């Protein structure tokens, strides 16, 4: 009789909603994509991977090729330990590099998208691109997701790289970077 309720005076509790400290994984033991997924409120590591690639793409668009190469040089850790072949050997540095060969080539030969002009990336355009290119549903807070990627990324970088990236980010996005 598993469906029978014995004590009707107690509220019904969904066991999946109970946080058991024995089952919780300490944040320092989470992988890069798990951190992005949990902190950003994303459904799975594939969503975390996709949005991380977009945030990284917009960040690279703001930087010189040399600065982007410095960052990539520090991101050689496994992004998500799993048995799934698609994510199995994925390094954080691979998320930093653009997966589209043409875009990757163009980003290496063009100057940073800063300063006056129609291609300038300010904070609003940064967040707009993340939301649109990342395919974020309207229920997901784009700033929360960006901060999730930023905080997971900062944990992988030296203080010198963290400061270098901050110097390239526009106003409000720089504040998000510093808060992460």
Model-derived features with residue positions:
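General marker for long, soluble alpha-helical cores
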Residues: 2-180
């Amino acid at each position: 009789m598993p469906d029978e309720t014995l004590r009707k005076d107690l509220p019904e509790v969904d066991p999946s909603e109970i946080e058991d400290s024995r089952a919780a994984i300490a944040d320092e033991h989470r992988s890069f994509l798990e951190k992005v997924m949990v902190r950003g409120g994303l459904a799975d590591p594939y969503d975390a991977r996709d949005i991380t690639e977009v945030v990284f793409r917009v960040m690279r668009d703001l930087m010189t090729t040399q600065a982007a190469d410095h960052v990539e040089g520090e991101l050689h850790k496994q992004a998500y330990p799993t048995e799934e072949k698609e994510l199995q050997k994925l390094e954080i540095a691979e998320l930093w590099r653009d997966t589209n060969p043409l875009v990757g080539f163009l980003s290496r030969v063009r100057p940073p998208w800063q300063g006056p002009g129609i291609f300038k990336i300010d904070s609003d355009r940064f967040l707009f691109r993340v939301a649109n290119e990342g395919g974020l549903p309207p229920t997901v807070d784009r700033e929360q997701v960006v901060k999730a990627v930023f905080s997971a990324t900062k944990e992988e970088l030296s203080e010198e790289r963290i400061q270098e990236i901050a110097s390239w980010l526009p106003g409000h996005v720089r504040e998000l970077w510093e808060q992460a």
